Amino acid sequence: MQAIKCVVVGDGAVGKTCLLISYTTNAFPGEYIPTVFDNYSANVMVDSKPVNLGLWDTAGQEDYDRLRPLSYPQTDVFLICFSLVSPASYENVRAKWFPEVRHHCPSTPIILVGTKLDLRDDKDTIEKLKEKKLAPITYPQGLALAKEIDSVKYLECSALTQRGLKTVFDEAIRAVLCPQPTRPQKRPCSIL
């Protein structure tokens, strides 16, 4: 069985841990708990192929900037996450996460993931953003950013409702099993 290492990065509180817990346990966790490296392992079938998917959670907070890259070696695919209702987390994909991932892993495939899809149409959330002269991130905006960072795919999901959730991980596996023809075969990430 092929083992795939998938590392999830993004700002603190965008829902990385909820994404992983909801996917692996089919249950949405309660309160927000900042993360320091939790690992999950799941045996899954994608396109009739059994895969052992190793899921590596990371801490988005700046306090962990020096520690986080220790989880990057031998990564097969990255999920760079931002919250669809946090324009700052969207901007940080460009400003922080993409440069960090590419610095350590120049050719590892990336999937861009917009989280908290259930809140994009939530009236209270929209109102709170409007008070700050902000708005939720739209699908075309996500697509444009994915193109800019040369992401394999752009996907949106909700860990709460599980909408689009399975697709995120299926596509992460496909990005490794069936690399895009325009890309040369990727070497796993390594830090020297």
Swiss-Prot record:
Positions annotated as propeptide: 190-192
Cysteine methyl ester PTM sites in chain numbering: C189
GO terms of biological process kind: actin filament organization; chemotaxis; cortical cytoskeleton organization; establishment or maintenance of cell polarity; positive regulation of lamellipodium assembly; regulation of actin cytoskeleton organization; regulation of cell shape; regulation of neutrophil migration
Listed InterPro entries: P-loop_NTPase, Small_GTP-bd, Small_GTPase, Small_GTPase_Rho
Family per similarity comment: Belongs to the small GTPase superfamily. Rho family.
Predominant localisation class: cytoplasm
Notes on how activity is controlled: Regulated by guanine nucleotide exchange factors (GEFs) which promote the exchange of bound GDP for free GTP, GTPase activating proteins (GAPs) which increase the GTP hydrolysis activity, and GDP dissociation inhibitors which inhibit the dissociation of the nucleotide from the GTPase.
Known catalytic reactions: GTP + H2O = GDP + phosphate + H(+)
One GO MF term: GTP binding
Protein name listed in UniProt: Ras-related C3 botulinum toxin substrate 2
Subcellular location as annotated: Cytoplasm; Membrane
Organism the protein comes from: Bos taurus (Bovine)
Membrane topology listed for this record: Lipid-anchor
Gene3D superfamilies with a match to the protein in the record: P-loop containing nucleotide triphosphate hydrolases
Encoding gene (name): RAC2
Modified residues (N6-acetyllysine): K147
S-geranylgeranyl cysteine lipid attachment residues: C189
